[in-house]
């Protein structure tokens, strides 16, 4: 589960508003705990290793009253919050970060053991990819810098006057964008499996990993920081 609050202060009140009350019983099933830990670690690792992405403020596997088994909390940059504008690079980052949980499950437990816990993440990925192609003009080549969707009056977007051929091309590009993001995410997590495992162990032991602990873990493996060259294999799959 992914969340992006607007402030650095992450406290009980904010948690209650965004993800519901913390369950006092915690998580007792060891297998479920490990699964959720790997899922959330996948999101957090992808965010931490994606240049210029939102800061990971908190990762937890403590269940919530709204049904969430755990969540990863982000702090967006002030510039993005103030402007409300997002670059293509940032949106591609959103795709791979959102897929981090599902991909981590597949890597660790195998395709046959992947759960439905990522359903919301997959919907988010599809929605972002659709808007990139049909609304924001980020088509690779077939559609060009054209918006094929318009506001629907309810805060969302509906189809404009696009032909069946154009709709088919939109679907094709959206599907490919999602597939490329999945492949890029898998490459990154496989290359950083030791980091994924260590963060998971921390979550199983502590249940919650905060900003300072997350920074310390990333710094242990990347003392010189995250740079664009390091993530080029993942970026290349999305170009």
Regions found by a protein language model. Give the residues of each.
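Conserved P-loop NTP-binding catalytic core
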Residues: 21
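Contiguous, non-catalytic segments that form substrate-binding/exosite surfaces or channel walls
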Residues: 14
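Soluble catalytic regions of large protease machineries
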Residues: 24, 31-38, 44-239
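Conserved AAA+ ATPase small/helical "lid" subdomain
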Residues: 1-10
């Amino acid at each position: 589960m992914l969340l992006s609050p607007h402030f650095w202060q992450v406290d009980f009140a904010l948690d209650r508003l965004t993800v519901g009350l913390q369950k006092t019983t915690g998580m007792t099933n060891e297998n479920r705990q490990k699964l959720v830990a790997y899922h959330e670690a996948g999101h957090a690792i992808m965010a931490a290793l994606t240049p210029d992405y939102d800061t990971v403020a908190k990762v937890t596997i403590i269940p919530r009253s709204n049904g969430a088994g755990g969540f990863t909390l982000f702090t967006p940059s002030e510039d993005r919050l103030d402007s409300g504008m997002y670059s293509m690079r940032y949106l591609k980052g959103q795709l791979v970060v959102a897929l981090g949980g599902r991909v981590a499950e597949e890597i660790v437990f195998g395709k046959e053991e992947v759960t439905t816990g990522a359903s919301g993440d997959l919907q988010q990925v599809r929605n972002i990819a659709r808007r990139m192609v049909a609304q924001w003009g980020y088509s690779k080549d077939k559609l060009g810098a054209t918006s094929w969707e318009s506001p629907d009056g309810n805060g969302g977007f509906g189809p404009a006057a696009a032909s069946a051929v154009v709709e088919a091309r939109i679907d094709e590009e959206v599907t490919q964008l999602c597939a490329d993001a999945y492949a890029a995410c898998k490459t990154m997590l496989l290359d950083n499996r030791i980091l994924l495992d260590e963060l998971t162990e921390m979550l199983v032991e502590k249940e919650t990993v905060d900003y300072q602990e997350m920074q310390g873990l990333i710094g242990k493996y990347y003392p010189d920081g995250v740079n664009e060259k390091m993530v080029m294999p993942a970026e290349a799959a999305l170009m």
